C-alpha cells in the first residue's frame, strides 16, 4: 500500500484579512501530517508554496517543510512561485532531480508519479508546452498498462472553470498518452477548494489550501481571496491523505480540516 499526503497553496508571504497568518496555518498543516499516526511515503505540495516568489519566502517554506516526518517531500510550482523569473528561484530551491522547467517522474511502491509544470507561459489557461508533452509521452512508453499512474500539477488538468483560468489548454494531449492505463489519477491545487471529476479513465481531484479559500466557480466576477466569519477559516483549510492498495484502480482519499 502507498500512503501519502497532499498539501497545497500555502502562499507564504500573503498578508490580508482572509488569513492574517499564513505561516501559522501552514505550520498547523505540517503538525497534522506529523501526527497522523503513521509515516507517509511522501508529502507532495501542489504549488503556490509562496505568494510572491521571494528568496526569503522560498527559504521559509523549505525550512518549514524540512520538518515533515516523511522520507520524501515533492513539489510542483504554482504561478505565484514564478512571478518574475519564469520559476528560476523556485527551481534553485526545489528543482533538484527535475528536468526542463521543473518536471519529473518517480516510481514508489509500484506506482508511477508524474509531476508537471503548467504555470509558465500562462495566457488564460495553464499550459504544458511541447517539451513537457514529449516528456510525458516518452516517460510512460516503457510502462505496462496496469501500472497505476498519479499525476501532480498546480492548475487542474481538466476544465474546472476556464473563465477563471481553471484548466490547462493542452492537457488533453498529455492525457491521451495515459489512455491505455487502467488507473490514472490527477491531483491539483490552485483552486483552493475540493472538487472531483471523472473523465474516461482519469479521475481528477482538486485539493484545498492551507492559506485562504477562493469562491466557488462563477460565484462573483473573479477568484479573489475570501474572508470568512471569525472562527470559520480553519474549517475551509486542510490536508489530504491518499492511499493506494495494489490491484485497485481508485485511490482512497481522506480530507482533514485544520481545526
Residue positions per predicted region:
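N-terminal active-site segment of His-dependent metallophosphoesterases
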Residues: 1-59, 138, 160
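Hydrophobic beta-strand anchors of alpha/beta hydrolase catalytic cores
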Residues: 4, 43, 113, 149-150
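Active-site glycine-centered loops adjacent to acidic/histidine catalytic or metal-binding residues
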Residues: 9, 47-48, 78-79, 154, ...
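Surface-exposed cleft-lining segments at the edges of enzyme active sites
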Residues: 14-16, 49-50, 119-130, 158-163
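Extended active-site neighborhood of metal-dependent phosphoesterases/phosphodiesterases
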Residues: 54-148, 170-185, 197-200, 208, ...
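Short, well-ordered beta-to-alpha junction loops that form the rim of enzyme active sites
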Residues: 118, 152-157, 189-191, 256
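Short acidic, glycine-rich surface-loop motifs adjacent to enzyme active sites
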Residues: 143-160
Amino acid at each position: 500500500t502507498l500512503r501519502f499526503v497532499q498539501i497545497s497553496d500555502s502562499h507564504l508571504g500573503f498578508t490580508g484579512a482572509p488569513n492574517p497568518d499564513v505561516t501559522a496555518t501552514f505550520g498547523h498543516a505540517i503538525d497534522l501530517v506529523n501526527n497522523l499516526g503513521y509515516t507517509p511515503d511522501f508529502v507532495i505540495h501542489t504549488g503556490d508554496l509562496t505568494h510572491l516568489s521571494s528568496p526569503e519566502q522560498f527559504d521559509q517554506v523549505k525550512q518549514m517543510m524540512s520538518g515533515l516526518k516523511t522520507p520524501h517531500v515533492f513539489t510542483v510550482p504554482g504561478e505565484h512561485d514564478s512571478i518574475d523569473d519564469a520559476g528560476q528561484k523556485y527551481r534553485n530551491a526545489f528543482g533538484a532531480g527535475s528536468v526542463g522547467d521543473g518536471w519529473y517522474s518517480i516510481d514508489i511502491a509500484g506506482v508511477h508519479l508524474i509531476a508537471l509544470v503548467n504555470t509558465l507561459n500562462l495566457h488564460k489557461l495553464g499550459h504544458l508546452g511541447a517539451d513537457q508533452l514529449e516528456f510525458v509521452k516518452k516517460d510512460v512508453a516503457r510502462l505496462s498498462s496496469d501500472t497505476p499512474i498519479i499525476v501532480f500539477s498546480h492548475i487542474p488538468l481538466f476544465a474546472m472553470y476556464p473563465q477563471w483560468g481553471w484548466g490547462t489548454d493542452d492537457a488533453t494531449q498529455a492525457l491521451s498518452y495515459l489512455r491505455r492505463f487502467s488507473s490514472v489519477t490527477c491531483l491539483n491545487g490552485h483552486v483552493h477548494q475540493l472538487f472531483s471529476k471523472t473523465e474516461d479513465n482519469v479521475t481528477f481531484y482538486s485539493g484545498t489550501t492551507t492559506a485562504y479559500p477562493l469562491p466557488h466557480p462563477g460565484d462573483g466576477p473573479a477568484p479573489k481571496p475570501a474572508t470568512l466569519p471569525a472562527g470559520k477559516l480553519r474549517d475551509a483549510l486542510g490536508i489530504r491523505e491518499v492511499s493506494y492498495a495494489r490491484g485497485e484502480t481508485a485511490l482512497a482519499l481522506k480530507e482533514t480540516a485544520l481545526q
